[in-house]
Regions:
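Beta->alpha loop/short-helix hinge microenvironment recognizer with preference
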Residues: 1-272
Length: 272
């Protein structure tokens, strides 16, 4: 669609993200649910955008050093459908989507509500060094500490256009924790790889780990069987996507999307 596309990232704080070590399916499901509810609710607020938005979310669980670092990358068209369905409501500023402070506060509150619900319903399991969190008092104290800190939501500058969005999705959606190109050497039971230190002005550094520790970190990022790491919400949700996208294009005065059969034929043809 001929609109700006924004890149919004929801990140779990370390003490909460660590719960995924023993409860990956529950924590990642709550992460999707809380981020989606946050974006949809804040965008629908008449004081903000006042529209029904749609977006695609991709789960990543790693940091550059391969430690557990759960976060969601969301690609969001800059606008949405008016409540009466008669207008496209664009962002008031082409470079600004929604206030990150408001998003972060809402995200924290919604996530912790769903997290406590999961605990109360017995859907969270703790053992080993984390066994103590199975006690209501200890778990409640963890949530109280998490409620007092800032939860980070980044809204990155808009993509250059739909073509850049497609390039981003092609590169980013199927990425794994570390690519072969970052691994410098495997020798003498050790693995040396490149990583970017965001806390030190994004400097590229090298890290050497024992092979067992490298494998342990890599295995942290294998998702539960059948878990879907790419999901669509709002007017991009699967159940109504075709109709909603057709409405969006009509409201924007944009051409209809080419049929999939035509796209497949086009990809199979050679120029000249």
């Amino acid at each position: 669609m001929p609109v700006p596309y924004f890149h919004v990232v929801f990140t779990l704080p370390q003490q909460i993200g660590g719960l995924a070590l023993q409860n990956a399916r529950e924590i990642y499901t709550i992460l999707f649910r809380a981020a989606a509810e946050t974006l949809l609710t804040i965008a629908a607020d008449p004081k903000r955008l006042g529209a029904a938005v749609g977006f695609l979310a991709v789960l990543h669980t790693w940091g550059q050093n391969l430690h557990l670092h759960p976060h969601l990358h969301c690609v969001v068209p800059g606008g949405g459908i008016s409540p009466d369905g008669d207008r496209w409501v664009g962002c008031r500023k082409q470079s600004f989507f929604l206030p990150v402070q408001v998003l972060g506060s809402r995200f924290r509150n919604v996530f912790l509500i769903y997290l406590k619900e999961a605990f109360d319903q017995g859907r969270l399991q703790f053992h080993g060094e984390m066994a103590g969190l199975g006690r209501p008092a200890a778990f409640g104290a963890l949530c109280s500490r998490a409620r007092r800190i800032k939860w980070v939501v980044h809204a990155k500058p808009p993509f250059g256009g739909p073509e850049q969005v497609l390039k981003y999705l092609a590169r980013y959606t199927h990425r794994v924790a570390i690519s072969n190109s970052r691994i410098l050497s495997i020798a003498d039971g050790k693995v040396t790889f490149l990583w970017k230190d965001y806390a030190d002005d994004n400097k590229t550094k090298t890290m050497t780990l024992d092979a067992v520790e490298f494998i342990r970190r890599f295995l942290l990022h294998i998702l539960p069987a059948g878990f879907v790491r790419i999901r669509q919400f709002g007017f991009l949700a699967n159940r109504a996507r075709r109709e909603k996208l057709a409405l969006c294009r009509a409201l924007l005065g944009a051409p209809s999307a080419a049929p999939r059969s035509a796209l497949r034929r086009g990809r199979g043809q050679k120029n000249g």
